[in-house]
Amino acid sequence: MIRIGIHGASGKMGYEIISNLKNNEQAILSVAYTIEPMPFDVGDAIVTNDLKTLFDNSDVIIDFSIKDGAVNLINYARTNPKPLIIGTTGLGSEGDELIKLASSVMPILQATNMSLGVAVLNRLTEFASRVLDGFDIEIVEMHHRRKVDAPSGTALTLATHAAKARNLTLDSVRVSGRDGMIGARSKDEIAVMSLRGGDIVGRHTVGFYNDGEFIELNHTATSRATFAKGAIKAAIWIKSKEPKLYSIYDCLGL
């Protein structure tokens, strides 16, 4: 059995992963790392706030924490290599560069979204952006009121795929909001808008708009379990991989 440690175990994703590990035939929960009191039962797993304990008792570590916590984890792993699944979003360019650097000594899979459906949506977005070259692209993401980062990492990934398909860099065309007399929409811009409210797990819409017609691609998550199952699948997959930075597409064969 593969021993999986959860970094950020007391959060919502930690709960979902731990719940989905209970009946898994290939992996078990070995360590629940948290700086907060554990709000639910983790069985025989070790509960700790010590990174050494987490690393010593895990074959693979799944991270769903916050930016500072994820950065600390990765820095520790650079001198104590261990396969990592990084699901924390909002790390910024410095965090992404740190992950690339760390992947030279351990296998790391970084994904802004662990679901199969979103992985397919990314591929569809790239295809549609290339084929529908003259269409305007607008992306809208919706999440629960407690989500702290905006736009979502998934929305930015979708926008990156759209820009890449048109040989553009996202930074050069991204629009985050519109207000006032801003003038007409430019040809290449890609808008990424965020809505927050209620308990929405996650909804992403990529719209392609032209005169006389439009297409909208949509993914709605109704349960965090879909992300948890994807993270566990990735953890099992990455255990035997060589040091490298992997994507969810590598794991899913897309």
Curated annotation (Swiss-Prot):
Keywords: Amino-acid biosynthesis, Cytoplasm, Diaminopimelate biosynthesis, Lysine biosynthesis, NAD, NADP, Oxidoreductase. Its EC number is 1.17.1.8. Disulfide bonds: none annotated. This is 4-hydroxy-tetrahydrodipicolinate reductase. One of its GO terms (cellular component) is cytosol. It comes from Campylobacter fetus subsp. fetus (strain 82-40). The gene is dapB. NCBIfam families: dapB. Gene3D superfamilies: Dihydrodipicolinate Reductase, domain 2, NAD(P)-binding Rossmann-like Domain. Belongs to the DapB family.
